[in-house]
Amino acid sequence: KLLENRFNVVEILKALIFDLEKFTNEREHNQKVIEDNYWLFGEQFHLVSADKNFEILLNNYFAHLEIDNKKPETIDNKEKLKRPDIFISRKSDIPDATNNDLTIEENIIVELKRPSVVIGSEQFQQVERYLRFIIEEERFNSLRRNWKFILVGKKVDDYIIDLYENQKNKGQKYLVQSIRNYEIYAMTWD
């Protein structure tokens, strides 16, 4: 039954992206499917927030990390009202002979684009602004936190293809930017 349900989810996404392209938009269609089926990015992830602003995202993130705050966190930055589509996270134990408690956090922010939008400079810059926001807001940062920003659409343009070319020495398919423990990927649905 689980496999059948997952197969059906993939078929629904295919129909939304390839057959119903003119009618599909990211917020009402693709995002709802991904939000309910974030396993598409890995079984081990947990949904932290969907279509919420960065201030809510930070508070949900602290709850996910089991950081006990007496009052909600606030962010003093006008960009805090930006709303990434999906934010998922996981914690993994890292083998270390000197420290039994060492874990690494992997965080993924997903930005979905309607099938009619070709991913290019404008979409990349939107995700790059999210990356900059996370870097500049110290409460999101730690040496034990890795961040991936994944931009997903039906097609990419030459600008993105050039960014792939620029990052090919890193050995990561779809990678378009890498800074310290932050990476941006531009992926297509196929």
Where are these regions (language model features)?
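Charged, terminal alpha-helix-loop-beta segments
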Residues: 1-190
